Curated annotation (Swiss-Prot):
Pathway: Membrane lipid metabolism; glycerophospholipid metabolism
Reactions it catalyzes: sn-glycerol 3-phosphate + NAD(+) = dihydroxyacetone phosphate + NADH + H(+); sn-glycerol 3-phosphate + NADP(+) = dihydroxyacetone phosphate + NADPH + H(+)
Cellular compartment(s): Cytoplasm
Gene Ontology biological process: carbohydrate metabolic process; glycerol-3-phosphate biosynthetic process; glycerol-3-phosphate catabolic process; glycerophospholipid biosynthetic process
EC number: 1.1.1.94
Pfam families reported in the protein's UniProt record: NAD_Gly3P_dh_C, NAD_Gly3P_dh_N
Lineage, broadest ranks: Bacteria, Pseudomonadati, Pseudomonadota, Gammaproteobacteria, Moraxellales
Record organism: Psychrobacter cryohalolentis (strain ATCC BAA-1226 / DSM 17306 / VKM B-2378 / K5)
Record keywords: Cytoplasm, Lipid biosynthesis, Lipid metabolism, NAD, NADP, Nucleotide-binding, Oxidoreductase, Phospholipid biosynthesis, Phospholipid metabolism
Protein name: Glycerol-3-phosphate dehydrogenase [NAD(P)+]
Length: 431
């Protein structure tokens, strides 16, 4: 005989199983990640971030000791991709660094060093290397893509046949040259069924390799993916914060390169701290203005992926975009500067893309337009800077005070003020 309690228990079991099936369906592309990352019994649906963070912290030591907990591959052997692969391997994740060139892979495996991009920094013994894309990608939980923006779409097309449940995290900052697409847009175009995220922040690779305290942001609509990335990369020297504003985090990482070029140019003229502060804050204003127009949360730009990344990139001579700007400020042509740098400076293309979009859609971006004039129209940098300083009156923080982006309102105010001044002088003369 089955009692009422037994029936109730069966009902509860059925209900629980149904909820589990729904949760598993929602997160089917993340199979095994949370279990490998935390070994906790927490469900996947509507996870409590504080509870998961606590569970991850408790299990972090075990995660670091057991290399089978999370299986990762980083595509791209540049400075940042190498730094992230090294960090994951050091944390105990089963990590492979994929590099296209077979000879480079052999050299890295033999020397345990990326001599081209991170010379002098020994990589973790547990880090594996591969030039075979299929072998590197299959049977992994997360694919981190750290290739230049120009190669991002082609890389996704190359791995598409080998996708069988992996999640993708973009480490690439910038926009596609001809389409104005961000990396998340390209992922949705090429692999629409894949669970994905983007990572961005003030992350100079050499400082990370030196174990200097740093932090970044993982943005994804998938809470399990956010927690998995945090578990994989979090360490005593590297904190990973979470966000669900993919657009804002990604735009912060792309747009700040523009103002790093501006800051590098300004440094070439040996400007003072006032000028640097002005470039930094007015650059942030442009970033948030453009971001809101694109659907981002303006508050995101006050975080690590916004002002944090902007500050680091604008104040460090390690920044490729800063160095490009500095060379331009010293009289080099853009072609000569890029050739001397020998690496990709995403900001050069971003300036052109943002200038065109802002012009088309009426977004007020004076610093961007000025840089475009210098780089693509061969205008004198000093003359363009003086023109910027002579621009019309504006309020400081436009999310606090309403803006009229045209100068019509300003012109009317000035005309009224001039008329009033003439009347006052006339009255004084009559007296």
């Amino acid at each position: 005989m089955i009692s009422a309690n037994d029936k109730s228990t069966d009902t509860n079991v059925d209900s629980t199983q149904a909820e589990q099936k729904i949760a598993e369906k929602q997160n089917k592309l993340l199979s095994g990640i949370i279990e490998r990352a935390t070994k906790s019994s927490l469900g996947r649906k509507k996870l409590n971030p504080s509870v998961v963070e606590s569970a991850v912290a408790k299990k972090m030591e075990e995660i670091h000791k057991n290399p089978t907990k999370l299986r990762l591959v980083v595509l791209g052997g540049g400075s940042f991709g190498t730094a992230m692969a090294n960090l994951a391997a050091r944390n105990g994740c089963d990590t492979t660094l994929w590099v296209r060139n077979k000879r480079t892979v052999k050299a890295m495996a033999k020397s345990q060093m990326n001599k081209k991009y991170l010379p002098g920094y020994k990589l973790d013994d547990r880090l594996k290397y591969s030039h075979e894309l299929q072998a590197a990608v299959k049977d992994t939980d997360i694919i981190f893509i750290a290739v230049p923006g120009l190669a991002f779409r082609e890389t996704l097309k190359s791995i598409a046949p080998f996708i069988s449940g992996q999640s993708i995290v973009s480490l690439t900052k910038g926009m596609e040259k001809d389409t104005f697409s961000l990396m998340s847009d390209i992922i949705k175009d090429e692999l629409p069924e894949v669970n994905f995220g983007v990572m961005s922040g003030p992350n100079l690779a050499i400082e990370i390799m030196k174990n200097m305290p740093s932090a970044t942001v993982i943005a994804s609509e998938s809470e399990p993916l956010r927690h998995a990335v945090q578990a994989a990369l979090h360490s005593a020297f590297f904190r990973v914060f979470a966000s669900d504003d993919i657009r804002g985090v990604e735009l912060g990482g792309a747009l700040k390169n523009i103002y790093a070029i501006a800051m590098g140019m300004a440094a070439a003229y040996e400007v003072g701290e006032n000028t640097k502060a002005m470039i930094l804050t007015r650059g942030l204003a442009e970033m948030s203005r453009f971001g809101v127009h694109a659907g981002a949360n303006p508050l995101t730009f006050l975080g690590l992926s916004g002002v944090g990344d902007l500050y680091a990139t604008c104040s460090s001579e390690l920044s490729r975009n800063y160095r490009i700007g500095n060379m331009l400020g010293r009289g080099m042509t853009i072609d000569a500067a890029v050739k001397k740098l020998g690496q990709t400076a995403e900001g050069v293309n971003t300036i052109q893309q943002v200038h065109e979009k802002a012009t088309k859609e009426g977004i007020y971006m004076p610093i961007t337009h000025a840089l475009y004039a210098v780089i693509y129209e061969d205008k004198a940098a000093l003359g363009v800077a003086l023109h910027l300083m002579e621009a019309g009156f504006r309020s400081d923080v436009e999310f606090v005070m309403e803006h009229d982006h045209s100068n019509a309102s300003l012109t009317a105010q000035m005309q009224t003020a001039n008329s009033q001044s003439k009347e006052d002088k006339s009255k004084q003369g009559n007296k």
